[in-house]
From Swiss-Prot:
InterPro entries: ABC_transp_permease. Part of an ABC transporter complex involved in glucose import (Potential). Responsible for the translocation of the substrate across the membrane. It comes from Haloferax volcanii (strain ATCC 29605 / DSM 3757 / JCM 8879 / NBRC 14742 / NCIMB 2012 / VKM B-1768 / DS2). GO terms for molecular function: transmembrane transporter activity. The gene is tsgC13. It is a multi-pass membrane protein. The complex is composed of two ATP-binding proteins (TsgD13), two transmembrane proteins (TsgB13 and TsgC13) and a solute-binding protein (TsgA13). The keyword Transit peptide does not apply. It holds the Pfam family BPD_transp_2. The chain crosses the membrane at residues 3-23, 32-52, 60-80, 89-109, 139-161, 193-213, 216-236. Belongs to the binding-protein-dependent transport system permease family. This is Putative glucose ABC transporter permease protein TsgC13. GO terms for cellular component: plasma membrane. It is found in: Cell membrane.
């Protein structure tokens, strides 16, 4: 596999993590609940999926357990923010710290373990032909099942939110919970549902990370991807289709820094300005420097959101971060 094909394949793998986590955060925020605990939910999903796969040898069962672990931690966030009306930011950060601590403690004995996770696969019948397409064949038509599921999730989430009664009611809860309640929509129930579904997506992202992307467990292996997923929701302006674009953009940056050690862009020493450009290129392509690119891009995205305040204000759910107090007659 050429460097370019390998880079694209790694981009797909890295983008899947961000896409799943970002879609889950989007659903939660559409209901008016900010979830900053995505990082912690991804970690418990990664560890839960890895342990079950290591014990049973069944990576699908491990993937399901990873989803369940993310949903369990999300249920705690929902209880704190919806029932107890706690500050959503504080609750989310606390759950990220909790998830990090729990997985570091309980996962310490699994660091040296190896598993057989999701294998790369091709589409039935046509896949064996598509995989031979130049450049994109190896990247997009020989991936893991979770990569395909993440791509499928984009139109599914779009249809769920904008074409189903349940999705439209969730959006209504995030825009104007008082009016939704007046129309008979169970605000608390749907907010719980959205947050827990979002946690399931985060758990799936973590399970993909440990069962497909790396097929190993390392404490803190999400390395900030949960925070990037939260920023991606702003980048996407709460739209699933734009989430796909953002996930692949950040996935490319993530993959580029992972594969930068095998890349050489040195100019011919006799070329003009080679003495100036070679040190600059070597610095920019340094793996330690490149590891900061996804996070620098995240800062740039959030800065752009601040500059484009009006467009973001129009896109953000009106009741985001707002607790709902139902008035009793």
């Amino acid at each position: 596999m050429s460097f370019a094909a390998g880079l694209l394949n790694a981009t797909v793998q890295a983008a899947t993590v961000l896409l799943l986590a970002g879609l889950g955060e989007l659903i939660s925020e559409r209901a008016g609940v900010l979830n900053l605990g995505v990082e912690g939910m991804m970690l418990v999903g990664a560890l839960g999926g890895f342990v079950v796969t290591a014990v049973t040898g069944n990576y699908w069962l491990g993937f399901g357990v990873g989803i369940a672990c993310g949903m369990a931690l999300a249920a705690v966030h929902a209880f704190l923010c919806i029932s107890l009306k706690s500050n959503q930011v504080i609750s989310g950060v606390m759950l990220t710290l909790l998830g990090t601590g729990l997985t570091t403690f309980f996962g310490s004995g699994w660091v040296q373990e190896s598993i057989t996770g999701f294998p790369q696969m091709t589409f039935p019948i046509v896949g064996r032909y598509l995989v031979h397409l130049p450049l994109v064949g190896e990247a997009f038509f020989r991936s893991t099942a979770t990569d395909y599921l993440a791509l499928l999730a984009v139109p599914v989430v779009w249809f769920f939110l904008y074409r189903s009664n349940l999705g439209l009611e969730i959006i209504a809860v995030g825009e104007d919970p008082e009016m939704a309640d007046t129309m008979g929509v169970p605000v608390f129930k749907f907010r719980y549902l959205a947050v827990i579904i979002g946690g399931g997506f985060a758990g799936a992202a973590g399970a993909h990370l440990s069962l497909a992307f790396s097929q190993l467990w390392v404490p803190g292996m999400t390395v900030g991807r949960g925070w990037i997923a939260v920023a991606l929701v702003v980048f996407a302006q709460w739209r699933p289709s734009r989430m796909l674009v953002g996930a692949y953009l950040f996935g490319l940056l993530d993959a580029l820094q992972l594969r930068s050690q095998s890349l050489s862009l040195a100019l011919d020493p006799n070329a003009p300005l080679a003495g100036v450009l070679n040190p600059l290129v070597n610095t920019l392509m340094n793996p330690q420097i490149m590891s900061t690119y996804p996070y620098l891009t995240t800062i740039a995205v959030l800065s752009y959101a601040v500059i484009r305040t009006e467009s973001v204000r129009l896109a953000v759910p009106s009741a985001l971060l707002q607790s709902y107090n139902r008035e009793m007659d």
